[in-house]
Amino acid sequence: MRRRFLSGIGGATLLLSCFLVTASAQAITYAPVDQPGPALTVPQSALDASLVCTGSVTGAARAPVLLVPGTGGDPAQNYSWSWEPALNKLGIPWCDVTLPDHTQGDVQVAAEYIVNAIRTMYARAGRKISIIGHSQGGMLPRWAFRFWPDTRGMVDDDIGFAASNHGTTGAKFACMPGCSPAAQQQSDTSQFIAALNSYQETFPGISYTEVFTHFDEIVTPNSDDTGSSSVHGGGGEITNVAIQEVCPADISDHLALGTQDNTAYALAIDALSHPGPAIPSNVPMSVCTDPLMPGINKTTYPADVASAAIGFAENEADAPSTTTEPPLKCYVTASCLESRAAVEGKARKCKKQKRHRAAEAGKRRHCKHKKKRH
């Protein structure tokens, strides 16, 4: 684990294409980090319907928390039986967001829901919000920060559980012959992951707490803070920490980490309780004596966890399937934006020329009409 201020900007590369190509064949120049975010393409009615909040979010006395589910999950599976009751007990306002195709569609589309959620919660609360996300849900907010800069000043803590920040090596095998668009995008060699981490991984003003487990069988590798979930550089204040560094005997896997693990819970609550990211040394060893986080009803736990597992399985069975990664959106790459601006400039010039020709034709008709009268 390392808690530190990290800064630095990665080098740029040459753009050759705006659409999906193999990373080895062509390099890409990404949009600058200060490029204003694009307009959202998802209908506002769908964005609004996706966000469910407690009433205390409006004018909140403390930072409300946005709960973002992982791939194959909805808030019902990820949070309804664990994190939502836990936050209620602590008096922390929260919202959860339901993403298209059970968080298995194009992650770039899902990111628009996150952008809307951040903006909506910030406006309602009148203050910065915090985010807790599992797996893809831990990575998604970073796409929002990267390509919608206005969201950066709206977020205090960004907390990821087993976040797929650098993709996973397992996607190569899971996606043979095909898999969901989101799974394709979360391959460690995908264009999406390269774009996500382009130029800088974090941004000043946001505290990043990235919690991972050495027993993660989905997001790999995650043996130390050079693994997939950890983030580095860019100016954000960062804690990358394995639950085993706090509780060495904790054997939670990928799913347990983001839904029920007590060590992960303690680290997240510590992060929410003071400025900056989690400080692992603040977590008492007594946390290690109970594997289940507060908020879980131990009487109904067997039924709750079974229901969640069935829900994940049913969602994954309904997942759309593709053999290729969705192409990067135009706003991601610099030359695509430049090409679009050039095309739009030409279109404006053509319209102006047409208006000029129409005006000239009108003048000629007027002169002809005057000659006939005389």
Predicted regions and their residues:
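Active-site catalytic motif of lipid deacylating hydrolases and related acyltransferases
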Residues: 28-44, 52-128, 299-326, 333-341
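Loop/turn elements at helix/coil->beta-strand transitions in domains of secreted/extracellular proteins
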Residues: 61-64, 90-95, 124-129, 151-157, ...
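C-terminal catalytic-base region of ester-bond hydrolases, centering on the histidine
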Residues: 204-342
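Polybasic, low-complexity, intrinsically disordered segments
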Residues: 340-374
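Serine-dependent carboxylesterase/thioesterase catalytic core
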Residues: 69, 108-202, 218
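Sequence contexts marking disulfide-bonded cysteines in secreted/extracellular proteins
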Residues: 52-54, 174-180, 246-248, 287-289, ...
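Secretory pathway export signals and precursors
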Residues: 14, 49, 91, 171, ...
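Secretory targeting and sorting signals
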Residues: 1-26
